[in-house]
Amino acid sequence: MRTRIKICGLTREADVDAAVEAGVDAVGFVFYAKSPRAVSVAHAAALARRLPPFVTPVGLFVNAAPHELAAACAAIPTLMLQFHGDETPAQCDAVGRPYLRAARMTPGFDLLNFAQQFSSAQALLLDAYVEGYGGGGKVFDWSLVPSGVTPPLVLSGGLSAANVTDGVLKVRPWAVDVSSGVESAKGIKDADAVRRFCEAVREADARVAASEI
């Protein structure tokens, strides 16, 4: 199985183009004002129009009001939602869009129970716990991930070309998500780093395929 790839925190046309060129499956736009990678709905919509078919735009939200979610969905008709705050299952479902739900991994966190609560999610995005909200660019202990979790898992948190191969081999996620690990500055992606990250994911997939022969 091919591991899907999402690049998050895009703010520039050139970075969207580089991600598409590298073969990513999804790109993320941050709609959280406190993030250095935050973009307006109008800017995100303009960036999303550069995406070819079968590359999914994803909007990251933290405790957003219903009207904010509705505005983003109206501006970007194909938008998938990613909830990174304290949203309840009912709040996530109420929008009526496919969504990812972030889980902040710490020792003792009951991911199986969390997965049951958010069984309607398209996937659970596993990130390291940091103070505040949003990704902190930190790697969590991958051994905390139990087997048999549904829905599918998206591995996130401090990934880069240097460690994503190992992460895919150990966790076997449906997808991986990276932001700071492919940046030259906050919100500014490095096209070469994006390319190397994607190559490292494909290297992991090749190893998995070889082991199954």
UniProtKB/Swiss-Prot annotation:
It catalyses: N-(5-phospho-beta-D-ribosyl)anthranilate = 1-(2-carboxyphenylamino)-1-deoxy-D-ribulose 5-phosphate. One of its GO terms (molecular function) is phosphoribosylanthranilate isomerase activity. One of its GO terms (biological process) is L-tryptophan biosynthetic process. The keyword Isomerase applies. Its EC number is 5.3.1.24. Belongs to the TrpF family. HAMAP family: PRAI (MF_00135). This is N-(5'-phosphoribosyl)anthranilate isomerase. The lineage of its organism: Bacteria, Pseudomonadati, Pseudomonadota, Betaproteobacteria, Burkholderiales.
